[in-house]
Amino acid sequence: MKKGTVLNSDISSVISRLGHTDTLVVCDAGLPIPKSTTRIDMALTQGVPSFMQVLGVVTNEMQVEAVIIAEEIKQHNPQLHETLLTHLEHLQKHQGNTIEIRYTTHEQFKQQTAESQAVIRSGECSPYANIILCAGVTF
């Protein structure tokens, strides 16, 4: 369910079509995207836009009730992991709900992307900079 405005028409469209528990992926430049899943490619060059920039825009527009993250981010990208947890903490306060954080293996994560409504690819080039957002409702 949409809750704001975004300039990218593909992102705006996919968020407006999300129902409760539907999923949307924000990923780094290297995540394989299944052919069966809609790809919204925002990557311009390495690092542009960053994972956190794309995630910030998407979560400003989307009501989030849960997220799925690869367990490997804790060891291989701890700085981004901490930044991500801080972002989710602020998002919880802004939305007025608790966001469930689930961890899975990177292999399972990649399989789950096939079930998502779309995958939004950032220009991020750091390991495991990927998240599955599970849509909530605003009421």
Curated annotation (Swiss-Prot):
Disulfide-bonded cysteines: none
Sorted UniProt keywords: Carbohydrate metabolism, Cytoplasm, Isomerase
Swiss-Prot/TrEMBL GO biological process terms: D-ribose catabolic process
Substrates-to-products reaction catalysed: beta-D-ribopyranose = beta-D-ribofuranose
UniProt: substrate binding residues: 28, 106, 128-130
One Pfam family named in its UniProt record: RbsD_FucU
Active site: 20 (proton donor)
One Gene Ontology term, aspect cellular component: cytosol
One GO molecular-function entry: D-ribose pyranase activity
InterPro entries on file: D-ribose_pyranase, RbsD-like_sf, RbsD_FucU
Pathway(s) this gene product operates in, as recorded in its UniProt entry: Carbohydrate metabolism; D-ribose degradation; D-ribose 5-phosphate from beta-D-ribopyranose: step 1/2
Compartments reported by the entry: Cytoplasm
Enzyme class per UniProt: isomerase
Physiological role: Catalyzes the interconversion of beta-pyran and beta-furan forms of D-ribose.
Record text on subunit structure and interactions: Homodecamer.
HAMAP family reported in the protein's UniProt record: D_rib_pyranase
Family of this protein: Belongs to the RbsD / FucU family. RbsD subfamily.
Protein name per the record: D-ribose pyranase
Source organism of this protein record: Escherichia coli O127:H6 (strain E2348/69 / EPEC)
